[in-house]
Amino acid sequence: ALCIQHSALLTGEIMTPEKLIDLAKEAMMHAYAPYSGFYVGAALLCADGTVYQGCNIENAAYGPTNCAERTAFFKAVYDGHRDFTAIAVCGGKDGVITGAFPPCGVCRQVMREFCDDDFVLYLVDKDGFETVTLKDILPHSFSPKKHMGLD
């Protein structure tokens, strides 16, 4: 169930990209997307091995819609996590993965709030996945260090 986080510390397993992707695919099936029919799932790996899943949650007014990536991050932050290693993201029409969909700009900035340039993203498509870093998708970013004049 989505309310129970997966933890490699409890099971002794190594969280591979493929396992993280499987958790993102599982999360995608919980999306609430009655308007677009576009389902997105994410699985966020914390530095301690805990994984948080998230799905997109649409709203009739569209503005309040929340992306899968932010859902996963917000759940993890609420539980006290601040160190993250990677995220797997998948999406597609009516729950069928149709291509790799990079995070939107708002999600990228949320990631930047908590993650360094080397944070890994696995962008899933129907034939596999592409590995990129946060710096790849958000160069010249506005980070907490820049905000505080430390960068």
Predicted ranges, named:
Residues 18-33:
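Short, basic/aromatic recognition patches
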Residues 12-22, 125:
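Short, compositionally biased leader-like segments
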Residues 24, 42-43, 72, 76:
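Small-residue (primarily alanine) positions within well-ordered alpha-helices
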Residues 151:
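Phosphate/diphosphate-binding glycine-rich loops and adjacent basic-rich segments that engage nucleotide
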Residues 1-10:
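Short, basic, low-complexity termini and linkers enriched in Ser/Thr/Gly/Pro
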Residues 37-46, 122:
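Short beta-strand scaffold segments in enzyme catalytic cores
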Residues 53-146:
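Zn2+-dependent cytidine deaminase-like catalytic core
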